[in-house]
Amino acid sequence: VADTQDGTQDDAQSDAAESQAGEWKIGLAEFAAGEEMDRYDGFWWSPDSKYVLFETFDASHEQTWYIADPADPTKPAQARRYPQAMTANADVHLTLLELGYDTDGCYYGGIAHNVEWDRESYEYLAAVSWTEGHEPLLLVQDRLQQHDQVLAVHVGEPIVTMSAPENGFTDEDGSEVETFSIAIPEYAPGEEPGTTRVLEEHSNDCWLDLIAGTPAYTPDGRLVCAMNDMDADTNRLTVDGTPFTPKGLQVREVLDVTDDDVLCVVQRTPELLPAADLPFLWQSNADDHDARSFDVVSIRYDGDWEPLTYVPGQWTMSRAGDGCVVTGRGMDDAAMQMQHCMNVRADGAAADADDADGN
């Protein structure tokens, strides 16, 4: 902040100084991500716990709003950064942290790498996912949310620790102190940890709907993405770029992805998916499975699908191994319900992983 000749502060220089200092947050989602994109996480562990992706953002470019507490008139108004139309958003960055462990498995430090993408063209970090055995995935969008990119983040090789026990160093008690060194691999240009490559790009002249749970890898490495299919008037899913979910079954959320199927929350559009084409389980109450009902279904990659909830209502599900948990309520129910289900073989034992039909 500088004083002018008449003794007043130069507002332009004051703003520049404030912007340079910034209002940085680490490990949190910026306001636009949480409020508009349903992304509330700001850091993501790798499945093997050897890496961490974390967000940092500078909110100093956003407008400041002052919010009072109507229940407590004596309390001063609180300042909050708030993104507004036609003004700057938070400046979002992503960092890949490689974690180092000694020979006893104790953490001793890490190496940080900036995750690189075209942040000027794609300023929204809409989604992050990390599937075991695969690189992390990012979904980034432009300001108008008419274009997006699905990116894979290169993580490189894990830090290698080499122990050197006979070093002559001792602590204050005279005990020998183990020392070690780390081997940092060399990478070709463009393959360094934190670099990204584009897997898919999508465009829509109107608007690209976000579908929670996408993008995602199947365990065997196929890429599942959202598709706003304007020709079919349906929000669909693709696997390696090919749409496989039915016309008229609007995918609202992906709950789980396996090599055999995806578990989804869907809404049916009757004009596009008539009652005659519905599975037997929904035939008796087909008229109620429409945009009012959020149903859980399993959809295979060949397009076959089956409903996993029968009563129209608001439903979701989680599954792991041989079990699943269904939660929600029907349209006539005031209270939430929870059902635990287990896939069991005819002999009463839990089904094997390669015997998912329970026979």
Name each model feature, range by range:
Residues 30-32, 113-118, 197-200, 242-246, ...:
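A short beta-strand motif characteristic of beta-propeller blades
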Residues 99-102, 155-158, 240-241, 300-303:
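Short loop/turn segments that connect beta-strands within beta-propeller blades
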